[in-house]
Amino acid sequence: MNFETIIGLEVHAELNTNSKIFSPSSAHFGEDPNANTNVIDWSFPGVLPVMNKGVIDASIKAALALNMDIHKEMHFDRKNYFYPDNPKAYQISQFDEPVGYNGWIEIKLEDGSTKKIRIERAHLEEDAGKNTHGTDGYSYVDLNRQGVPLIEIVSEADMRSPEEAYAYLTALKEIIQYTGISDVKMEEGSMRVDANISLRPYGQEQFGTKTELKNLNSFSNVRKGLEFEVERQAKLLRSGGVIRQETRRYDEANKGTILMRVKEGAADYRYFPEPDLPLYEIDDAWIDEMRAQLPQFPAQRRAKYEEELGLSAYDASQLTATKVLSDFFETAVSLGGDAKQVSNWLQGEIAQFLNAEGKTIEEIALTPENLVEMIAIIADGTISSKMAKKVFVHLAKNGGSARAYVEKAGLVQISDPAVLVPIIHQVFADNEAAVADFKSGKRNADKAFTGFLMKATKGQANPQVAQQLLAQELQKLRD
């Protein structure tokens, strides 16, 4: 029997506000344990939460970016559970009325076609702290993360393969990152993914029993975990077994999933309305204000790059991988840079430099203005393409004018025949053996003179002009 794979994903994204959702503590990542905490985070008796307006702003932007309807009345609920990293013994979340609902995004499939993935809901909640289990037999609780604002984005079960799930996550991450509401870095925990997967016989409408997967710390592991579950569940069903509703974690070392617990339902959390927070009204003016702050998203930018700038689909995809890179490209083109030349530099030398340095493009000194000027002085013959690589490294580390650096460093390309011909004659005089080889007809003897000339000019001879002049002067020797 063959089975159809049914996948839905739950994505948590930490919002990059300065302070937490209900307390004034900093939400900054990477501080010493419990440095970013106060009495609200510790859940001291009598303290009350205070809503961070910036969190609502971010949630509205997310809902708009994901083509969602927005609830005009926002309220919160208590999700009750006990765990050491949750000192209140409940989490403030949204249950029956999320901020956004009925959304969708488009994903691109491997064959080049697109598919619409529906999004059921997007709701706000506070993050929990972090437990660390020491080798000394003690467990330690860090509440820095407690109260950091989260938006949870829950897809419909519209994905039919691990590859589609991977494509969905890639598209969703791009959109969220473009809004600026989250840096969506899985390595820092600001983006986390849970996957729900079930199988059903082809032709059956009813879903099978789902399994939830956790500990998916990369998009690659999401795909691997889902691939393992497809095989595990299919094998179990074919042998007459029954799939239980349970939570499993992906074990990267063993490339498989391991049972964590039998899955709880909503009733286990005893949701009820949060009594310490009021109802928040979201009017059309507020929504319009947030809509006006949204950028053009990757799909629209890719279409523009292909249709208006003549770039390939591959180039357009690479240039829109991050908003910072796309903005850099667009600024350079708006300043007069040739789109293909700018694209080639961003994907070639610049990408290699960034990878080697472990930096992003906003962390180096190069600006779009610098790059456009450098491309211009390559085009007008001031420097060669080879010399431009050296110029780029200087600009990446120090910034400044490309032309000014080239002139100060004596890197201007020599293209004047009146300057080059005497140097060629001197090369002939300094390399009599090579001249003799050439005159005697020795194979490839002429090629040595190119190297001699470039050495004599310290690499500054214009290669095209130099080749032309060398050919002329060598012909005179032969005559």
From Swiss-Prot:
EC number per UniProt: 6.3.5.-
The keyword Ligase is assigned to this record: yes
Key word NAD present: no
Protein's GO biological process: glutaminyl-tRNAGln biosynthesis via transamidation; translation
GO molecular function ontology, one term from the record: ATP binding
InterPro entries: Asn/Gln-tRNA_amidoTrfase_suB/E, Asn/Gln-tRNA_Trfase_suB/E_cat, Asn/Gln_amidotransferase, Asn/Gln_tRNA_amidoTrase-B-like, GatB, GatB_C_1, GatB_Yqey_C_2, Gln-tRNA_amidoTrfase_suB_CS
Coiled coil residues, start to end: none
HAMAP family xrefs: GatB
UniProt name for this protein: Aspartyl/glutamyl-tRNA(Asn/Gln) amidotransferase subunit B
Organism, scientific name: Streptococcus pyogenes serotype M6 (strain ATCC BAA-946 / MGAS10394)
